[in-house]
Amino acid sequence: MNKIDELTPKKVVEKLDNYIIGQKEAKKQVAIALRNRIRRLSLSEDVRKDVIPKNILMIGSTGVGKTEIARRLAEVANAPFVKVEATRFTEVGYVGKNVESMVRELVDSSVNMVKKEMMEEVKDKAQRLVEERIVEVLVPSKKRAKAQPSFMDVMQLFNQNAEYSQNKDYDENEDENIRRRREELLEKLRNGELEDVEIEVEVEEQSSPMFAGLGPELEDMGIQFGEMFQNLMPKKKKRRRMKISEARKVLEPIESEKLIDQDKLIQEGVSRAENSGIIFIDEIDKITSKGVSSGPDVSREGVQRDLLPIVEGTTVMTKYGSISTDYILFIAAGAFSEAKPSDLIPELQGRFPIRAELSDLTKEDFIRILTQPKNAILKQYQYLLQTDGVKIEFTEDGVERMADIAFELNEKVENIGARRLYTVVEKVLEEVSFEAPASGEWELKIDSNYVDLRLGKVYGDEDLREYIL
């Protein structure tokens, strides 16, 4: 059983619990959807082709965890993931990006993911090649100019046999000296003794996109053609002077890429995008037509109709070849505060059979969000300030007070969910963050009194809190 087979729905939910508080139903549904994809891969070919993923529609107000659930799911499954906003697309024929661009982005993400894995596999070999290349720069071999023989050279051929053995001995001695010198420097290089030595290396010059500034759709096409032309043209190279420590970072990706099988990379990247890819479509409620059939709503419905074949399953042309969207998992999300899921066109509703409703966060949820997740908000600030020698301790009543203020602000001003916590915590720690670098090492206890001291004036003034918190 390999690593992906071990991802049972329960284990997926457990992993999601490390990052996301609450929303048990939504976690359960995405975990089942992921497991069904794993089950599908175990089926025979004739059955597998008929089993398509059941797409998910998440319904919940902003800041309750919709995006985070989808993003962490892709992370757990090590699957290619791309997030797009439905509002950025326009109907075919209008100025703007068309819906096929999301599939191209997914394939790019997938290929880059596979490339990163392959580069990690050849990392040791690439590092050795980089060291050899650096040593060759430090101790270059003798360059022998090969000019056309002159008349005098031809006349001297009679004496060449007599001189050949002497020249050969000289060349061999010189090559031996170069080899010995390189071995000495290689040992020093591996011991880190030469990191600050400056050398001159030859690197490929980065060229600007050929079709930039043409508008979203034409630019998308232009990038495909631009990369194709750049691959046909010889690469421009330039010489740069840098320290060996920097040269390692510049040369390692170049050497790693030479060791990678590009055909295998593209094949695996495309396959992973088609069979494991996840596309998260946010703000899908913003393209509902609400029963109106004129004005800007015509374009909104047009976007829905353009989305339909992508979600149903079609073939999209990309720079890596044709990509089938039949088995890509689509997760759509929206607050649906001013519209209902039933306002989507019926055909699109039918393509998102699983509905996951996310509940609004409570004060207790806020307390848990501040403290419980892996690298929770308060832990992040503690780590950041610790780098400047400041040790922060949050008391229980201090955490409760921040959660209480964030919850009340969501109730009275605008409900932005857990994002409100960042605003509150940032304001509480504003003075500390400003003073920390110049104050040396010190400790600070943040309790409810300190929170009120930092937020009292802003929180008490209705006009100020609307603009600042």
From Swiss-Prot:
Keywords: ATP-binding, Chaperone, Cytoplasm, Nucleotide-binding, Stress response. One of its GO terms (cellular component) is HslUV protease complex. InterPro entries: AAA+_ATPase (IPR003593), ATP-dep_Clp_protease_ClpX (IPR050052), ATPase_AAA_core (IPR003959), Clp_ATPase_C (IPR019489), HslU (IPR004491), P-loop_NTPase (IPR027417). It holds the Pfam family AAA_2. One of its GO terms (molecular function) is peptidase activity. ATP binds at residues 21, 63-68, 282, 347, 419. It comes from the Bacteria. It is found in: Cytoplasm. One of its GO terms (biological process) is protein unfolding. The keyword Cytoplasm applies. Belongs to the ClpX chaperone family. HslU subfamily. A double ring-shaped homohexamer of HslV is capped on each side by a ring-shaped HslU homohexamer. The assembly of the HslU/HslV complex is dependent on binding of ATP. ATPase subunit of a proteasome-like degradation complex; this subunit has chaperone activity. The binding of ATP and its subsequent hydrolysis by HslU are essential for unfolding of protein substrates subsequently hydrolyzed by HslV. HslU recognizes the N-terminal part of its protein substrates and unfolds these before they are guided to HslV for hydrolysis. This is ATP-dependent protease ATPase subunit HslU. It comes from Petrotoga mobilis (strain DSM 10674 / SJ95). The gene is hslU.
